[in-house]
Amino acid sequence: MEFWQNIYVNFDVVAFEIFGLKVHWYGIMYVLALLVALMVAKYYAIKDNMGISKAMLDSYFIWVEIGVILGARIGYILIYDAHTLWYLTHPWQIFNPFYNGEFVGIRGMSYHGAVVGFLIATYAFCKKNKQNLWKYLDLVAISVPCGYIFGRIGNFLNQELFGRATEVPWGIYVDGILRHPSQLYEAFLEGFIVFIILLLIKKYKKYNGELIAYYTILYALARFVCEFFREPDFGIGFVAFGMSMGQILSLLMFLLGLFLSFYLRNIKKNL
Protein backbone atom coordinates (compact mmCIF):
# COMPACT_ATOMS: atom_id res chain seq x y z
CA MET A 1 0.00 0.00 0.00
CA GLU A 2 3.01 2.28 0.30
CA PHE A 3 2.98 3.23 -3.39
CA TRP A 4 -0.73 4.01 -3.25
CA GLN A 5 -0.43 6.04 -0.06
CA ASN A 6 2.32 8.14 -1.65
CA ILE A 7 0.76 8.38 -5.10
CA TYR A 8 0.68 12.18 -5.01
CA VAL A 9 4.43 12.25 -4.44
CA ASN A 10 5.03 10.19 -7.58
CA PHE A 11 2.29 11.65 -9.77
CA ASP A 12 2.43 14.79 -11.92
CA VAL A 13 -0.86 16.66 -12.35
CA VAL A 14 0.37 17.74 -15.81
CA ALA A 15 -0.17 15.05 -18.44
CA PHE A 16 1.90 16.69 -21.19
CA GLU A 17 2.82 20.03 -22.76
CA ILE A 18 2.02 21.43 -26.21
CA PHE A 19 4.12 24.41 -27.27
CA GLY A 20 4.68 25.31 -23.63
CA LEU A 21 1.00 24.96 -22.74
CA LYS A 22 0.51 22.49 -19.89
CA VAL A 23 -2.35 20.03 -20.30
CA HIS A 24 -3.53 18.77 -16.92
CA TRP A 25 -5.05 15.37 -16.22
CA TYR A 26 -8.02 17.23 -14.75
CA GLY A 27 -8.71 18.85 -18.11
CA ILE A 28 -8.51 15.49 -19.87
CA MET A 29 -10.92 13.94 -17.36
CA TYR A 30 -13.28 16.91 -17.75
CA VAL A 31 -13.43 16.41 -21.52
CA LEU A 32 -13.94 12.67 -21.03
CA ALA A 33 -16.78 13.40 -18.62
CA LEU A 34 -18.54 15.52 -21.24
CA LEU A 35 -18.02 12.99 -24.03
CA VAL A 36 -19.21 10.05 -21.92
CA ALA A 37 -22.32 11.93 -20.78
CA LEU A 38 -23.11 12.89 -24.38
CA MET A 39 -22.62 9.33 -25.66
CA VAL A 40 -24.82 7.87 -22.93
CA ALA A 41 -27.51 10.47 -23.65
CA LYS A 42 -27.43 9.68 -27.38
CA TYR A 43 -27.62 5.95 -26.66
CA TYR A 44 -30.74 6.23 -24.52
CA ALA A 45 -32.34 8.85 -26.78
CA ILE A 46 -32.19 6.31 -29.62
CA LYS A 47 -32.85 3.20 -27.53
CA ASP A 48 -35.96 4.69 -25.90
CA ASN A 49 -37.14 6.33 -29.13
CA MET A 50 -37.43 9.72 -27.43
CA GLY A 51 -37.81 11.66 -30.67
CA ILE A 52 -34.68 13.75 -30.07
CA SER A 53 -32.32 13.95 -33.05
CA LYS A 54 -28.54 13.72 -32.68
CA ALA A 55 -28.20 17.25 -34.06
CA MET A 56 -30.66 18.59 -31.49
CA LEU A 57 -28.84 16.73 -28.72
CA ASP A 58 -25.45 18.10 -29.84
CA SER A 59 -26.88 21.62 -29.82
CA TYR A 60 -28.41 21.05 -26.40
CA PHE A 61 -25.12 19.88 -24.88
CA ILE A 62 -23.38 23.02 -26.12
CA TRP A 63 -25.99 25.11 -24.31
CA VAL A 64 -25.65 22.97 -21.20
CA GLU A 65 -21.85 23.11 -21.19
CA ILE A 66 -21.92 26.91 -21.31
CA GLY A 67 -24.50 26.98 -18.52
CA VAL A 68 -22.55 24.50 -16.40
CA ILE A 69 -19.23 26.35 -16.70
CA LEU A 70 -20.81 29.73 -15.94
CA GLY A 71 -22.87 28.35 -13.06
CA ALA A 72 -20.05 26.27 -11.57
CA ARG A 73 -17.55 29.11 -11.56
CA ILE A 74 -19.93 31.84 -10.40
CA GLY A 75 -21.38 29.48 -7.80
CA TYR A 76 -17.90 28.80 -6.41
CA ILE A 77 -17.16 32.52 -6.21
CA LEU A 78 -20.42 33.26 -4.39
CA ILE A 79 -20.49 30.24 -2.06
CA TYR A 80 -16.94 29.07 -1.35
CA ASP A 81 -14.33 31.64 -2.38
CA ALA A 82 -12.85 33.81 0.35
CA HIS A 83 -12.46 36.72 -2.10
CA THR A 84 -16.08 37.04 -3.24
CA LEU A 85 -16.23 40.83 -2.89
CA TRP A 86 -13.00 41.25 -4.86
CA TYR A 87 -14.36 39.16 -7.73
CA LEU A 88 -17.65 41.07 -7.70
CA THR A 89 -15.71 44.30 -8.19
CA HIS A 90 -13.37 42.65 -10.74
CA PRO A 91 -15.79 40.38 -12.67
CA TRP A 92 -13.41 40.03 -15.63
CA GLN A 93 -11.10 38.02 -13.35
CA ILE A 94 -13.69 35.31 -12.65
CA PHE A 95 -12.78 33.39 -15.81
CA ASN A 96 -9.15 34.50 -16.10
CA PRO A 97 -7.12 31.29 -16.73
CA PHE A 98 -3.76 33.00 -16.08
CA TYR A 99 -1.99 33.63 -12.78
CA ASN A 100 1.17 35.75 -12.70
CA GLY A 101 1.46 35.30 -16.46
CA GLU A 102 1.22 31.50 -16.30
CA PHE A 103 -1.68 29.50 -17.72
CA VAL A 104 -3.27 27.59 -14.82
CA GLY A 105 -6.79 27.06 -16.14
CA ILE A 106 -10.02 28.04 -14.41
CA ARG A 107 -9.78 26.88 -10.81
CA GLY A 108 -12.63 26.60 -8.35
CA MET A 109 -15.91 25.07 -9.51
CA SER A 110 -19.09 24.41 -7.52
CA TYR A 111 -21.30 21.42 -8.35
CA HIS A 112 -24.37 23.10 -6.90
CA GLY A 113 -23.64 26.22 -8.94
CA ALA A 114 -23.27 24.01 -12.00
CA VAL A 115 -26.75 22.60 -11.33
CA VAL A 116 -28.26 26.09 -11.37
CA GLY A 117 -26.45 26.94 -14.60
CA PHE A 118 -27.56 23.64 -16.13
CA LEU A 119 -31.22 24.23 -15.23
CA ILE A 120 -31.22 27.75 -16.65
CA ALA A 121 -29.55 26.57 -19.88
CA THR A 122 -31.94 23.62 -20.23
CA TYR A 123 -35.01 25.78 -19.69
CA ALA A 124 -33.79 28.40 -22.19
CA PHE A 125 -32.94 25.74 -24.80
CA CYS A 126 -36.28 23.92 -24.49
CA LYS A 127 -38.19 27.20 -24.56
CA LYS A 128 -36.37 28.40 -27.68
CA ASN A 129 -36.66 25.09 -29.55
CA LYS A 130 -40.13 24.14 -28.23
CA GLN A 131 -38.89 20.91 -26.62
CA ASN A 132 -40.30 18.96 -23.67
CA LEU A 133 -38.30 20.20 -20.68
CA TRP A 134 -38.89 17.16 -18.46
CA LYS A 135 -37.94 14.72 -21.19
CA TYR A 136 -34.54 16.41 -21.53
CA LEU A 137 -34.05 16.55 -17.77
CA ASP A 138 -34.69 12.80 -17.52
CA LEU A 139 -32.16 12.15 -20.25
CA VAL A 140 -29.58 14.22 -18.38
CA ALA A 141 -30.39 12.42 -15.12
CA ILE A 142 -29.38 9.07 -16.61
CA SER A 143 -26.29 10.35 -18.45
CA VAL A 144 -24.69 12.80 -16.01
CA PRO A 145 -23.74 10.21 -13.33
CA CYS A 146 -21.58 8.40 -15.90
CA GLY A 147 -19.70 11.57 -16.76
CA TYR A 148 -19.55 12.54 -13.09
CA ILE A 149 -17.33 9.53 -12.39
CA PHE A 150 -14.61 10.97 -14.63
CA GLY A 151 -15.07 14.44 -13.13
CA ARG A 152 -14.32 13.21 -9.62
CA ILE A 153 -11.40 11.11 -10.84
CA GLY A 154 -10.15 14.36 -12.36
CA ASN A 155 -10.36 16.00 -8.93
CA PHE A 156 -8.35 13.11 -7.50
CA LEU A 157 -5.66 13.38 -10.17
CA ASN A 158 -5.56 17.15 -9.69
CA GLN A 159 -4.88 16.61 -5.98
CA GLU A 160 -7.84 18.70 -4.84
CA LEU A 161 -11.01 18.26 -2.76
CA PHE A 162 -9.19 15.64 -0.70
CA GLY A 163 -10.60 13.88 2.35
CA ARG A 164 -10.29 14.22 6.09
CA ALA A 165 -7.39 12.79 8.07
CA THR A 166 -7.67 9.04 8.61
CA GLU A 167 -5.80 5.90 9.61
CA VAL A 168 -7.35 3.54 7.04
CA PRO A 169 -4.70 1.64 5.02
CA TRP A 170 -6.04 2.90 1.68
CA GLY A 171 -5.62 6.54 2.67
CA ILE A 172 -3.30 8.81 0.68
CA TYR A 173 -0.73 11.26 1.98
CA VAL A 174 -1.45 14.93 1.33
CA ASP A 175 1.24 17.25 2.69
CA GLY A 176 2.37 14.55 5.09
CA ILE A 177 -1.11 13.77 6.44
CA LEU A 178 -2.87 10.48 5.61
CA ARG A 179 -6.32 11.33 4.23
CA HIS A 180 -9.38 9.63 2.77
CA PRO A 181 -9.38 9.55 -1.07
CA SER A 182 -12.85 11.09 -0.83
CA GLN A 183 -12.89 12.06 -4.51
CA LEU A 184 -12.97 8.36 -5.37
CA TYR A 185 -15.69 7.72 -2.80
CA GLU A 186 -17.72 10.39 -4.57
CA ALA A 187 -17.02 8.92 -8.01
CA PHE A 188 -18.34 5.58 -6.76
CA LEU A 189 -21.35 6.70 -4.71
CA GLU A 190 -22.46 9.86 -6.52
CA GLY A 191 -21.61 8.49 -9.96
CA PHE A 192 -21.67 4.71 -10.34
CA ILE A 193 -24.17 3.78 -7.60
CA VAL A 194 -26.58 6.60 -8.51
CA PHE A 195 -26.44 5.51 -12.16
CA ILE A 196 -27.22 1.87 -11.31
CA ILE A 197 -30.17 2.83 -9.11
CA LEU A 198 -31.54 5.17 -11.78
CA LEU A 199 -31.31 2.37 -14.35
CA LEU A 200 -33.53 0.23 -12.11
CA ILE A 201 -35.99 3.09 -11.57
CA LYS A 202 -36.03 3.79 -15.32
CA LYS A 203 -37.52 0.35 -16.01
CA TYR A 204 -40.65 1.36 -14.12
CA LYS A 205 -40.77 5.03 -15.13
CA LYS A 206 -44.33 6.36 -15.15
CA TYR A 207 -43.99 10.03 -16.13
CA ASN A 208 -41.55 12.54 -17.60
CA GLY A 209 -39.46 14.18 -14.91
CA GLU A 210 -39.42 11.13 -12.65
CA LEU A 211 -35.73 10.38 -13.26
CA ILE A 212 -34.51 13.92 -12.61
CA ALA A 213 -36.52 14.00 -9.37
CA TYR A 214 -34.96 10.75 -8.18
CA TYR A 215 -31.51 11.85 -9.36
CA THR A 216 -31.81 14.97 -7.22
CA ILE A 217 -32.75 12.87 -4.20
CA LEU A 218 -30.11 10.19 -4.77
CA TYR A 219 -27.28 12.61 -5.48
CA ALA A 220 -28.14 14.65 -2.40
CA LEU A 221 -28.06 11.54 -0.19
CA ALA A 222 -24.79 10.28 -1.68
CA ARG A 223 -23.13 13.70 -1.43
CA PHE A 224 -24.31 14.13 2.17
CA VAL A 225 -22.67 10.82 3.12
CA CYS A 226 -19.44 11.54 1.22
CA GLU A 227 -19.09 14.90 2.95
CA PHE A 228 -18.37 13.03 6.20
CA PHE A 229 -15.11 11.84 4.59
CA ARG A 230 -14.28 15.04 2.69
CA GLU A 231 -12.30 17.88 4.23
CA PRO A 232 -14.59 20.91 4.76
CA ASP A 233 -14.01 23.75 2.34
CA PHE A 234 -11.09 25.98 3.28
CA GLY A 235 -12.18 29.24 4.86
CA ILE A 236 -15.70 27.93 5.56
CA GLY A 237 -15.32 24.81 7.68
CA PHE A 238 -18.45 23.50 9.35
CA VAL A 239 -21.43 25.77 8.80
CA ALA A 240 -24.10 24.58 11.25
CA PHE A 241 -24.80 21.59 13.50
CA GLY A 242 -21.44 20.09 12.56
CA MET A 243 -22.36 20.05 8.87
CA SER A 244 -20.31 21.34 5.94
CA MET A 245 -21.59 23.71 3.28
CA GLY A 246 -21.85 20.73 0.91
CA GLN A 247 -24.14 18.95 3.37
CA ILE A 248 -26.34 22.01 3.87
CA LEU A 249 -26.76 22.38 0.11
CA SER A 250 -27.37 18.63 -0.22
CA LEU A 251 -30.20 18.85 2.31
CA LEU A 252 -31.78 21.60 0.22
CA MET A 253 -31.36 19.45 -2.90
CA PHE A 254 -32.96 16.50 -1.12
CA LEU A 255 -36.00 18.58 -0.15
CA LEU A 256 -36.22 19.93 -3.70
CA GLY A 257 -36.13 16.38 -5.07
CA LEU A 258 -38.94 15.28 -2.73
CA PHE A 259 -41.04 18.28 -3.72
CA LEU A 260 -40.36 17.69 -7.41
CA SER A 261 -41.32 14.02 -7.13
CA PHE A 262 -44.57 14.88 -5.33
CA TYR A 263 -45.39 17.70 -7.75
CA LEU A 264 -44.82 15.65 -10.89
CA ARG A 265 -46.53 12.52 -9.57
CA ASN A 266 -49.66 14.26 -8.35
CA ILE A 267 -50.00 17.42 -10.42
CA LYS A 268 -48.10 17.05 -13.69
CA LYS A 269 -48.69 13.41 -14.57
CA ASN A 270 -49.31 14.17 -18.22
CA LEU A 271 -46.06 15.99 -18.92
Swiss-Prot record:
Its main location: membrane. The keyword NAD does not apply. GO terms for cellular component: plasma membrane. The keyword Transferase applies. It is found in: Cell inner membrane. GO terms for molecular function: phosphatidylglycerol-prolipoprotein diacylglyceryl transferase activity. Coiled coil: none annotated. A 1,2-diacyl-sn-glycero-3-phospho-(1'-sn-glycerol) binds at residue 152. Pfam families: LGT. Pathway: Protein modification; lipoprotein biosynthesis (diacylglyceryl transfer). It is a multi-pass membrane protein. The chain crosses the membrane at residues 18-38, 60-80, 103-123, 137-157, 181-201, 209-229, 236-256. Belongs to the Lgt family. This is Phosphatidylglycerol--prolipoprotein diacylglyceryl transferase. It comes from Campylobacter lari (strain RM2100 / D67 / ATCC BAA-1060). The lineage of its organism: Bacteria, Pseudomonadati, Campylobacterota, Epsilonproteobacteria, Campylobacterales. The gene is lgt.
